[in-house]
A protein has these predicted regions:
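Short Lys/Arg-rich basic patches
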Residues: 4-30
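Short, positively charged interaction helices/loops
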Residues: 64-103
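Non-catalytic regulatory/interaction regions at protein termini and inter-domain linkers
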Residues: 11, 15, 54, 58-60, ...
Length: 103
């Protein structure tokens, strides 16, 4: 079992900081490349650029919770939720939001 984790590509767990604007405010987010790849995939399936997807997600969390605590951790957890969904969910949710920020 440990081989599965130990032999993963080093690139997947290397960190990268990306700068973006959310509601006109410049910010930077540091995540491991595996998470950035997953977020790019989600954004693509939603038909959005990564920046637009992250802005939408941020706004949804803000609307639901009134504030956003630790957005980077929320993004990691969102990726875990996305990756844990069975393939059938993707077919069932086609045409509807695939990832609701408040989940």
């Amino acid at each position: 079992m440990c081989r599965l984790f130990a032999h993963q590509p080093a690139r997947d767990y290397e960190s990268q900081t990306r700068s973006l604007r959310i509601d006109g405010h410049a910010t930077s987010i540091r995540l491991e490349m595996g998470f950035w790849d997953t977020l790019e995939e989600i954004a693509g399936k939603e038909g959005k650029s990564l920046a637009k997807f992250l802005t939408q997600l941020y706004r949804e969390v803000l609307d639901y919770h009134g504030e956003v605590h630790n957005f980077a951790s929320l993004l990691r957890c969102s990726c875990l939720i996305y990756r844990s969904r069975p393939v059938q969910d993707e077919v069932r949710f086609r045409g509807e939001p695939r990832l609701v920020a408040a989940e």
